[in-house]
Amino acid sequence: MRISISYPPIESRKGVPLLAQNRQFQYFNEPTYIYPVIPAYAASLLDDRGYDVTWDDGIAERLSLKEYVARQDFQSPDLIAIETKAPTVKTYWRYIKQFKERWPHTTIAIMGDHVTAFPEESLENSPVDYVITGGDYDFQLLSLAEHLSKGVALSPGFWWTDKDGTVKNTGVYQQNNDVNDLPLIDRDLTKWWLYVKNGNFKYEPGTYTMVGRDCWWRQGGGCTFCSWTMTYKKYQVRTPESLLEEVEMLHKRYGIREIFDDTGTFPAGNWLVQFCNGMVERDLAFKIRIGCNMRFGALKEEDYKLMGKAGFRFILYGLESANQKTLDRLQKGTTNAQAWETLRWASKYGMDPHLTIMMGYPWETYEDARNTVEFAKKVFRAGYAETLQATIVMPYPGTMLWHQCKENGWLLTEDYDRYDMREAIMKSPLTNDQVKELTQDLYRVFMEPRYVARKLVSIRSRDDLAFAQRGVKYVYGHLKDFAKGSELNSDEEAEPLQRG
């Protein structure tokens, strides 16, 4: 049985659609292709169990739709698995209709956070064969392959339309598999080289791991805006030893120099201590640099000291806003005081903190949003952060924030195509142009003389220089992403596929 793990290319005037491994979605003018870790696990697990697997990321490979279709014509897969998010789901519905007309005997499955929230919607709007809910695409796709090839009963979390038109399902998805049972990702099968150039990697080549699924912060259900609260209801993590094994393999076999572990929040406590000590004991510290997502207030100063010794570099923090009322409404469970202290510790022990910030909350005034901009500038001027990502807050369908929008009448549109960060989707005291202006203002912190001077002084190697040059390119790309008039309405209809 041949199985294609697929990201069919979307040719858009908005830019390059980046949906793989992204909790948020955006079209980019200067794209960074992120390694789709869970689909890569799926490919590796299926291959390990004897299935013929192809990796067809048409977006990262920059294929045209016609080139992607020609490849699938040649490969003739029995099953195509497609990951989607809200802003791409309508396009993929159109694609699936055309794919089923062209390949009527190929089974097509769709997966992702959006279809997890609304599984019946894809069955109603496309001839897709199966909707996979939950985030464990690896275990779920193995279940589907075993069902199709051997008649084994499907695990919970599948939706499909029966021959009589009745929608059926196997019940609510259950996150009950042991992630330690998974094989290490087959990096060659999953074309690791497509994803080595990432704006966040200072030392190239770099790659991604994901030791946990997904975030251990789930108080009140977790952050209200996070789309992955729908796919990962509980926190699961592999052992520190398994990640150390993977890190060592990546360094020795592929010459990887930097890794970002994209677990929603990296494990803390004794797990972190064991991992850091293992990096030192295996003589991996600084031979390969480590990055991760972390929460403000989650660690103590001694933890950051240990991480510094273990070779951690890039640490991503979700600041989101500098207004406590917003942090409370988002259920972040953090404060500005924690942010300041955490960033000071991380920078003190040699790490490069990265901030994610969002603009356009329904309850924030212009003054509130400006307060966030000024707090971020203060952090950068103090030297406590090195990079940032500024975006427009999106109420992804199915999230707690989206339900709040529905209850309060905050939504400006329910056209999924427009949930792509090119415009504000929620009613707000701010105009759309003000949201974009504030977002651009955040990126202009990189142009301040003090920041530029500090970065110039810090350049000590070719890696430093190359990283700074890439940073300039990405900053100008982001300024273009949020330029006035950058929003476009729904993309043109997908071109009909012709047999060649």
PLM features: residue spans?
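Glycine-rich beta-alpha loop elements in corrinoid/cobalamin-binding modules
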Residues: 38-39, 45-175, 398
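Radical SAM [4Fe-4S] cluster-binding motif and immediate context
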Residues: 180, 185-354, 359-361, 374
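Radical SAM enzyme core and accessory elements
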Residues: 2-3, 72-78, 410, 414-500
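Short glycine-rich His-centered loop
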Residues: 3-31
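Short helix-capping segments at alpha-helix termini
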Residues: 101-105, 127, 280-287, 380-384
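Flexible glycine/acidic-rich beta-alpha junction loops that bind and position SAM and/or redox cofactors
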Residues: 12-16, 270, 325, 329-330, ...
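Short, solvent-exposed turn/loop segments enriched in Gly/Ser/Thr/Pro and often Arg
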Residues: 39, 59-60, 85, 263-268, ...
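Catalytic cores of alpha/beta
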Residues: 119-124, 303, 363-378
